[in-house]
């Protein structure tokens, strides 16, 4: 057999697939069982959620970064097949990670919980898989639960998604039921990769990570051609060239190989120093004989949510910078730049894909780098059109220009899809209306579940919307959103003043109709949280020059009349006047300490105005 025939023969036995599911439907457990069944790992190495390697992932039980692994499986027809399993995150913030990993596959196993049925993110991920023309194999998981209703769920898969679920595998990943049927279905139904091993190299980067010794390690799926050590390669998006040092596959552990050819999923190292050079979704080609065009699907990720991160101990500013640099190496979607605040000192303005992404980065900084952080209120990006025709992009409320010069402000809107049990439709619609949502569509999925679609401003979803949605449906709702563009809104910037001074870190942008209520609530909250001083402190909420709400923290005062028993009124008055004069002088020079809870109070605006 020639080299080409060998490669083509091997190619016909490759199956690339990923597992997609809603959070908690048992995706990582199924991956564990498949690894066990194909004996990729010994019993000794087996631990729960084997592919979730980050501590945080194991702790929260979610998948954040994607992982891939090569498995060998001897099928019933006697052939040995090579499987590449690519594990994907299920959370809405990491949709791009899902779409990239799906682009590296030919098939997807759709895991649906036999008790819960289809959820919003199941749908979102299925649509991504269909966009990538993948063969979808439905698997109904957790059939050993007492509340499982596999037949109802099978019907739901057919009705809601439109997939033929007549031969869906009934399985329980935890108990190890049905795993072999799943593997046999992969062999039969998932197509082998197409592509010419002799053509110019085309490989998709679907992830990258930074290794202190080898530089950047790119995770790739070879679509055409062959790549081997010593070859010169070129990145098509950035145009940078490198020489390949090592290629290999994961059998969860990295294992060097002689070459990677069509259909292989593995890793590649070349002396790449900067993660920015291996953009996820980019195409690698040969520098000598480059491919004519790149693979589709690459796009630069733009952050959706911004917030300020400040070290509580200002001496740790440089440590925070190093922490962000290291995290950025592994996370191409994190963006940051230095900023200063009069109230909080030096820190960074960081951009994230969404709220979960933001929480995870904060937690990793506090945990892995031991830096205590203060975070400011998250905000989205506003487009501000000025009266002189200029357009300004504002990601920090304190940069909002003077209201007199603004013609209009546009904010990002999202299309939010919620899957809700029937009984809670009213509560959810009320919540969405209160968040300035516009009703778009409502469909009954079956007798007791409804899908509701709203258009809403991203700014309203950013903070605590998901928590409120969960609490108004007793935890049963699921939720997914996609950006649909910018729309004009009546937005104003509200400043909070303490003792007549603006506190920049407490400024926020709010819709004009809600400004008065929002201002009133915050002023009252701050009054409770800021400790009393020796002089009285007015707290004011202002829009431009206009004060919309005010509250006063009363001064602590000593009883100066204690030693005047009875006594003449003029004597008492003299002592009181003297005390008053002292307080007045103090008020001119005194400054107010704002505790961290006060910043958090502005964020936790859960009592949003009811319409």
UniProtKB/Swiss-Prot annotation:
A biological process from GO = positive regulation of translation
One GO cellular component, as annotated: plasma membrane
Q: Does the keyword Hydrolase apply?
A: yes
Keywords carried by this UniProt record:
Cell membrane, GTP-binding, Hydrolase, Membrane, Nucleotide-binding, Protein biosynthesis
Catalysis performed (reactions): GTP + H2O = GDP + phosphate + H(+)
What membrane topology term does the record carry?
A: Peripheral membrane protein
Q: Give the protein name, as stated in the record.
A: Elongation factor 4
Annotated Gene3D superfamilies = 3.30.70.240, Elongation factor 4, C-terminal domain (3.30.70.2570), Elongation Factor G (Translational Gtpase), domain 3 (3.30.70.870), P-loop containing nucleotide triphosphate hydrolases (3.40.50.300), Translation factors (2.40.30.10)
| PANTHER family, per database record | TRANSLATION FACTOR GUF1 HOMOLOG, CHLOROPLASTIC, TRANSLATION FACTOR GUF1-RELATED
Indicate which residues the UniProt annotation says bind GTP: 24-29, 141-144
- Subcellular localization: Cell membrane
InterPro entries reported for this sequence: EF-4 (IPR006297), EFG_III/V (IPR035647), EFG_V-like (IPR000640), EFTu-like_2 (IPR004161), G_TR_CS (IPR031157), LepA_C_sf (IPR038363), LepA_CTD (IPR013842), LepA_IV (IPR035654)
The primary gene name is lepA
Q: Which family does it belong to?
A: Belongs to the TRAFAC class translation factor GTPase superfamily. Classic translation factor GTPase family. LepA subfamily.
**SUPFAM superfamilies recorded for this chain?**
EF-G C-terminal domain-like, P-loop containing nucleoside triphosphate hydrolases, Translation proteins
Give the first-level EC class, as a single word.
hydrolase
Q: Give the PROSITE patterns listed for this entry.
A: G_TR_1 (PS00301), G_TR_2 (PS51722)
Describe the location of the tr-type G domain by residue ranges. Answer: 12-194
Return one GO MF term.
ribosome binding
Q: Does the keyword Amino-acid biosynthesis apply?
A: no
EC nos: 3.6.5.n1
Q: What does this protein do?
A: Required for accurate and efficient protein synthesis under certain stress conditions. May act as a fidelity factor of the translation reaction, by catalyzing a one-codon backward translocation of tRNAs on improperly translocated ribosomes. Back-translocation proceeds from a post-translocation (POST) complex to a pre-translocation (PRE) complex, thus giving elongation factor G a second chance to translocate the tRNAs correctly. Binds to ribosomes in a GTP-dependent manner.
HAMAP family for this protein: LepA (MF_00071)
Tell me what organism the protein belongs to. Bacillus velezensis (strain DSM 23117 / BGSC 10A6 / LMG 26770 / FZB42)
Primary location: membrane
């Amino acid at each position: 057999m020639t080299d080409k025939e060998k490669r083509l023969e091997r190619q016909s036995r490759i199956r690339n697939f990923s597992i997609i599911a809603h959070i908690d439907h048992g995706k990582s457990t199924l991956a564990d069982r498949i690894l066990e069944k194909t004996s990729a790992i010994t019993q000794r190495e087996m631990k729960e959620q084997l592919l979730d390697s980050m501590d945080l992932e194991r702790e929260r039980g979610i998948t954040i970064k994607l992982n891939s692994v090569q498995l060998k499986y001897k099928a019933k027809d006697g052939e040995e097949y090579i499987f590449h399993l690519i594990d994907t995150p299920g959370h809405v913030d990491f949709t791009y990670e899902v779409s990239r990993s799906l682009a590296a596959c030919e098939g997807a196993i759709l895991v649906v919980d036999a008790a819960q049925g289809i959820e919003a993110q199941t749908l979102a991920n299925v649509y991504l898989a269909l966009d990538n023309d993948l063969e979808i194999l439905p698997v109904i998981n957790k059939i050993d639960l007492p509340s499982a209703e596999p037949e109802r769920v099978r019907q739901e898969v057919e009705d809601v998604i439109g997939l033929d679920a007549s031969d869906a595998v009934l399985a329980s990943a935890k108990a190890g039921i049905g795993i072999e049927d799943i593997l046999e279905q992969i062999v039969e139904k998932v197509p082998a990769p197409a592509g010419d091993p002799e053509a110019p190299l085309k490989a998709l980067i679907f992830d990258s990570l930074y290794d202190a010794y080898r530089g950047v390690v790119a995770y790739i799926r070879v679509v055409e051609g062959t790549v081997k050590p010593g070859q010169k390669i070129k990145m098509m998006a950035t145009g940078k060239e490198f020489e390949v040092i090592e290629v290999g596959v994961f059998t969860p552990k990295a294992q060097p190989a002689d070459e990677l050819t069509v259909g292989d999923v593995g890793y590649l190292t070349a002396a790449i120093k900067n993660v920015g050079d291996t953009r996820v979704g980019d195409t690698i080609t040969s520098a000598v004989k480059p491919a004519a065009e790149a693979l589709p699907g690459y796009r630069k990720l733009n952050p959706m949510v911004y917030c300020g991160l400040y070290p509580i101990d200002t001496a740790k500013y440089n440590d925070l910078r190093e922490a962000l640099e290291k995290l950025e190496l592994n996370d191409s979607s994190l963006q940051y730049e230095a900023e200063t605040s009069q109230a909080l000192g030096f820190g960074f303005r960081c951009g994230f894909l969404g709220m979960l992404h933001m929480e995870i980065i904060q937690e990793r900084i506090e945990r892995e780098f031991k830096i205590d952080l203060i975070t400011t209120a998250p905000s989205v990006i506003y487009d501000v059109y000025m009266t002189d025709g200029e357009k300004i992009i504002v990601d920090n409320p304190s940069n909002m220009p003077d209201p007199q010069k603004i013609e209009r402000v546009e904010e990002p809107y999202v299309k939010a899809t919620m899957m809700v049990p029937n009984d809670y439709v009213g509560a959810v619609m009320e919540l969405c209306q209160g968040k300035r949502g516009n009703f778009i569509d409502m469909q009954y999925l079956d007798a007791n579940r409804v899908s509701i679609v709203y258009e809403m401003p991203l700014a309203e979803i950013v903070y605590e919307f998901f928590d409120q949605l969960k609490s108004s449906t007793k935890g049963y709702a699921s939720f997914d959103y996609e950006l649909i563009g910018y729309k004009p809104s009546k937005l104003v910037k509200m400043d909070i003043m303490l003792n007549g001074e603006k506190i920049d870190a407490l400024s926020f942008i709010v819709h004009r109709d809600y400004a008065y209520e929002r201002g009133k609530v915050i002023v009252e909250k701050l009054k409770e949280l800021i400790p009393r001083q020796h002089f009285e402190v007015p707290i004011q909420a202002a829009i431009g020059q206009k004060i919309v709400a005010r509250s006063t923290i009363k001064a602590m005062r000593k009883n100066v009349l204690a030693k005047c028993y009875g006594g003449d009124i003029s004597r008492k008055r003299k002592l009181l006047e003297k005390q008053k004069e002292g307080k007045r002088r103090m008020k001119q020079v005194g400054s107010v300490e704002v505790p961290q809870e006060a910043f958090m109070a502005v964020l936790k605006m859960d009592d949003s105005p009811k319409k």
